[in-house]
């Protein structure tokens, strides 16, 4: 706006926290903006959806701001849902090498597949962003080497399998 304040206007379809049914159309299709749905909001996950789904959507928006691309951008709804549930987004720094490491960590924490690993409130998310802007240490921690390696293997299953077989052959010689 004219005071340089960001205004968030829409996350898609509103849903009452007391609602017992998912947001489903008359034809039985899940409704909403697919690219911003958290894993637990998609058809593939049948778990309780709470405010942490909004943290996910904010993480998607932050990722888009930093890379000018969506983290999950399949060709159709099924592919988008699959990517949201089972694939990791391309590492943010691969898409924009100028993004500081702490901001990458903040964004990836907001995009954790498991809601328990995400920021637990918008206040927590905002506080880490404020710490980043003040050059203070952030609360979010980067993924461990083990976590990064396991995510790499999941993203590159075929190549990882070939390397493992080659190493096994070399070890047996």
Label each PLM-derived region with a short phrase:
Residues 27:
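Flexible, glycine- and charge-enriched loops at secondary-structure boundaries
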Residues 30:
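Conserved, function-defining core regions and hallmark residues within catalytic/recognition domains
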Residues 9-11, 33-154:
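C-terminal lobe helix-coil module of Hanks-type protein kinase domains
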Residues 6-7, 14-18:
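Activation segment
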Residues 17-22, 48:
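Conserved catalytic-core motifs of eukaryotic protein kinase domains, centered on the activation segment
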Residues 1-9:
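Conserved protein kinase catalytic/activation segment
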Residues 153-173:
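Alpha-helical transmembrane signal-anchor helices
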């Amino acid at each position: 706006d004219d005071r340089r304040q960001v205004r968030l206007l829409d996350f898609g379809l509103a849903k009452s926290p007391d609602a017992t049914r998912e947001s489903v159309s008359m034809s039985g299709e899940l409704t909403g903006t697919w690219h911003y749905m958290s894993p637990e909001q998609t058809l593939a996950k049948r778990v309780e959806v709470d405010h942490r789904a909004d943290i996910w959507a904010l993480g998607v928006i932050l990722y888009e701001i930093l890379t000018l691309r969506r983290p999950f951008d399949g060709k159709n709804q099924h592919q988008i849902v699959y990517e949201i549930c089972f694939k990791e987004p391309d590492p943010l720094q691969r898409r924009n090498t100028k993004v500081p490491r702490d901001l990458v960590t903040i964004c990836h924490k907001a995009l954790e597949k498991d809601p328990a690993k995400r920021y637990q409130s918008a206040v927590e998310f905002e506080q880490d962003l404020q710490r980043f802007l003040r050059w203070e240490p952030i609360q979010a921690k980067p993924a461990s080497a083990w976590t990064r390696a396991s995510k790499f293997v999941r993203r590159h299953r075929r190549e990882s399998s070939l390397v493992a077989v080659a190493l096994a052959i070399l070890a047996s010689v």
